[in-house]
C-alpha cells in the first residue's frame, strides 16, 4: 500500500518468481522501483523485515558499499578511482515502471505493457464511488498453500463451488444466482447476492435466512433475532440494516446513495494475473496469489481486510503481515492439483457461465 511507504526512505522488497524488486519513497515523495541488485556484483541492495518493509536514507550495497540516492542516481563507491570505466552519468539504478491505483502500488517489469489505468479499464470508474484509497489495512494474512497459484486464484473468483464446499452458506447466499462479467482482456467480476436463499435449498424461509445471516456474522447482538416485517424480503431487511450499521461505523449517511448490493453482496473483481479486490461499502477483502519459491506446486495466498474509517478521525495504521495455517476454505486445493496432474485431456465438463472467467484467465495466461 502507498501508506506503508509514506515517508522518504521507506522501502518495500518484493520477491516473486525469481525477481527481487525494491520499491522506495524518494525525498520528493515519489515512488520509485528498481531491480533489487547492485550494478557492481549483483548483491541484493535491500532486505526488509519479514513483511518486506524497511527504512533507509539511501540505497547502499551491503557488500562493497556502492551507493545510490533514493531517486536512483549514483552517489559513489569506495576507491572509486579504481573504476575509471564507470560513467557516473550512466550508472543510475534502472527504474521499473510504477503506478498507483486505489492506494495500491503496482510495479511492472515489462516495458511494453499498457499503462496501468488502461489495463484496469472500466474498473477504475467502478471503484471511484467506493474510494479504496481511503481505506486502511486492518488485517493481513499470508498462507503457504500446496497448490499452483493459478489454482488457488481460480478457487476464489467463482461461487459455483459453494454448494459442495461451503453448504453452510446456502441458507443466505444466492450462489447459483451469481452474475459473471468479463470487461476486457484482464478484468472480470463476480457478484454473488447475499440475503437470499440458494436455489439449492428447500424449506428455508426468508425469516430463517435473516436469522442465519445475523448468527453467522454476529451482527448487533443487542437487536436480537428480529421478526421479518410483513411484505419485506430478507434481502431488503439486511440491506437496510447494513446501511444503518455502516453509516454509523463510517460517520457518513449512506442511505441516500448506497444500494443494498453495495452493502450486502460479495462483489469481487479479478485483475489478471493475481490481484482480486472486493468492492462496495462493506469492509472488504483483497486477495493476492503468488508463486512460492521455485515450486510450481506451491504458492502463497494473501488476504487483506480493507476497512473504512470516519474522515473526522486519524487514519489507523496498516496491519503487519501475519502467517497462519490454512483453513477449510482452502482444504480442497491439493486435491485439485493432483486431479489436474492426472488428466490426460481437458474434459468437456465445463459450465458455460460459471467457468467463463476461468477460460478468460487461461487464454491470457498462454496468450
Segments (PLM) and residue ranges:
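C-terminal catalytic domain of Rieske-type non-heme iron oxygenases
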Residues: 30, 99, 104, 108-367
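Extracytoplasmic c-type cytochrome modules immediately beyond a signal peptide or single-pass transmembrane anchor
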Residues: 1-2
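Rieske [2Fe-2S] iron-sulfur-binding domain
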Residues: 5-111, 115-126
Amino acid at each position: 500500500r502507498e501508506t506503508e511507504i509514506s515517508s522518504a526512505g521507506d522501502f518495500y522488497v518484493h520477491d516473486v518468481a525469481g525477481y527481487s524488486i525494491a520499491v522506495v519513497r524518494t525525498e520528493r515523495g515519489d515512488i520509485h522501483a528498481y531491480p533489487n541488485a547492485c550494478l557492481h556484483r549483483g548483491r541484493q541492495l535491500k532486505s526488509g523485515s519479514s513483511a518486506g518493509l524497511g527504512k533507509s536514507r539511501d540505497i547502499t550495497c551491503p557488500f562493497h558499499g556502492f551507493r545510490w540516492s533514493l531517486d536512483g542516481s549514483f552517489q559513489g563507491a569506495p576507491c572509486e578511482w579504481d573504476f575509471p570505466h564507470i560513467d557516473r552519468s550512466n550508472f543510475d539504478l534502472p527504474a521499473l515502471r510504477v503506478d498507483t491505483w486505489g492506494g495500491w502500488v503496482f510495479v511492472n517489469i515489462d516495458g511494453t505493457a499498457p499503462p496501468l489505468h488502461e489495463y484496469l479499464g472500466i474498473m477504475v470508474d467502478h471503484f471511484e464511488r467506493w474510494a479504496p484509497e481511503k481505506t486502511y489495512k486492518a488485517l493481513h494474512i499470508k498462507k503457504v498453500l500446496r497448490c499452483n497459484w493459478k489454482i488457488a486464484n481460480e478457487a476464489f473468483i467463482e461461487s459455483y463451488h459453494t454448494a459442495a464446499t461451503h453448504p453452510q452458506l446456502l441458507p443466505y447466499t444466492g450462489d447459483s444466482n451469481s452474475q459473471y462479467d468479463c470487461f476486457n482482456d484482464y478484468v472480470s467480476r463476480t457478484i454473488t447476492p447475499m440475503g437470499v436463499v440458494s436455489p439449492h435449498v428447500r424449506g428455508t424461509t426468508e425469516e430463517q435466512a435473516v436469522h442465519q445471516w445475523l448468527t453467522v456474522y454476529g451482527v448487533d447482538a443487542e437487536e436480537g433475532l428480529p421478526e421479518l416485517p410483513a411484505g419485506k424480503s430478507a434481502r431488503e431487511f439486511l440491506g437496510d440494516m447494513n446501511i444503518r450499521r455502516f453509516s454509523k461505523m463510517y460517520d457518513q449517511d449512506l442511505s441516500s446513495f448506497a444500494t443494498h448490493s453495495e452493502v450486502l453482496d460479495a462483489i469481487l473483481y479479478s485483475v489478471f494475473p493475481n490481484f482480486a479486490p472486493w468492492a462496495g461499502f462493506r469492509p472488504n477483502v483483497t486477495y493476492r496469489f503468488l508463486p512460492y519459491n521455485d515450486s510450481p506446486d506451491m504458492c502463497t495466498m494473501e488476504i487483506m481486510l480493507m476497512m473504512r474509517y470516519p474522515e473526522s478521525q486519524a487514519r489507523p495504521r496498516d496491519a503487519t503481515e501475519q502467517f497462519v495455517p490454512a483453513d477449510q476454505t482452502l482444504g480442497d486445493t491439493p486435491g485439485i492439483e493432483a486431479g489436474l496432474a492426472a488428466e490426460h485431456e481437458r474434459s468437456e465438463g465445463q459450465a458455460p457461465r460459471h467457468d467463463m472467467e476461468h477460460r478468460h484467465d487461461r487464454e491470457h495466461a498462454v496468450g
